Amino acid sequence: MGVSAEPRSLSVARAGLASPVIEKARSALLPSQDVEDTVETLMLHPVIKAFLCGSISGTCSTLLFQPLDLLKTRLQTLQPSDVGPRRVGMLSVFLKVVRTESLLGLWKGMSPSIVRCVPGVGIYFGTLYSSKQYFLRGHPPTALESVILGMGSRSVAGVCMSPITVVKTRYESGAYSYESVYAALRSIYCSEGSRGLFRGLTATLLRDAPFSGLYLMFYSQTRATVLHGADELDAALMPLVNFSCGVFAGILASLVTQPADVIKTHMQLSTVKCQCIGQVATLILKTHGLRGFFHGSVPRALRRTLMAAMAWTVYEEMMAKMGLKS
């Protein structure tokens, strides 16, 4: 009996010592489940949902309306020697691109546009949603609050995506040839430094921030007016209401911000260092007159209006499907 008791006590002691080790090993064997749970929790976060909805809506609108952006860029960068005495419009540029670069030439710059718009629109909607939840606590924004929220969200997205915007503009102009988006970023950084990757950022923010602020204000106020007292509105009509309000808001916001867009395009295409907004604006005025600040206004208004209207329509529908209030 005495001999057999010793091994039993040793086994109990060993079991006591081993249990923490076993538990530690067991927890180490199940990290994948913990990771899956963490990922699932993150994916269920409302801000992540808003980001995903915005990214998907941005992808759809970019694929459809990229040709309008290319035509806008080409119109804004026409030189007087290219135009001659006659006036060149969107149709003339469209026919020239199709004739010299084929129909697919209208989608030149598609890669940087997708790289820019997919995360860019996602960042915008994600920032906008989180800002609304934090500052407004679910209350509908006033006109001034809409302007501030729109401008702030667009500024965050604009700064994050500025290098890709520069590459996209140069692709679309036809004046630069890069092998890929990465090669373009590397070439710009090597030849122009980090400043080259953010060329035209101020003009971009002066264009995009007011556009988004005004757009959100017009969109929110128009939508609230249309839906006022219409609680029984058929759900099938909501996409049409959202799209119509988006078109109206886009036209107004595009007209106000067109000059800043022209200045931005010229700055991003220039390789001259330390060229400020005033210098570019003066050059445009001397070369093209006041009309030069509205070159490409038709394709830009069409593109921005339709893109924003479609993006918001898809975003609103997807957020509603996920049970979230946009």
Swiss-Prot record:
It is found in: Mitochondrion inner membrane. One of its GO terms (biological process) is erythrocyte differentiation. InterPro entries: Hem25/SLC25A38 (IPR030847), Mit_carrier (IPR002067), Mitochondrial_sb/sol_carrier (IPR018108), Mt_carrier_dom_sf (IPR023395). It is a multi-pass membrane protein. Its main location: mitochondrion. It holds the Pfam family Mito_carr. It catalyses: glycine(in) = glycine(out). It comes from the Eukaryota. Coiled coil: none annotated. One of its GO terms (cellular component) is mitochondrion. One of its GO terms (molecular function) is glycine transmembrane transporter activity. The chain crosses the membrane at residues 51-76, 109-135, 147-172, 200-223, 241-267, 296-314. Solcar repeats lie at residues 45-134, 141-225, 237-321. Keywords: Membrane, Mitochondrion, Mitochondrion inner membrane, Repeat, Transmembrane, Transmembrane helix, Transport. Mitochondrial glycine transporter that imports glycine into the mitochondrial matrix. Plays an important role in providing glycine for the first enzymatic step in heme biosynthesis, the condensation of glycine with succinyl-CoA to produce 5-aminolevulinate (ALA) in the mitochondrial matrix. Required during erythropoiesis. PANTHER family: MITOCHONDRIAL GLYCINE TRANSPORTER (PTHR46181:SF3). Belongs to the mitochondrial carrier (TC 2.A.29) family. SLC25A38 subfamily. This is Mitochondrial glycine transporter. It comes from Rattus norvegicus (Rat).
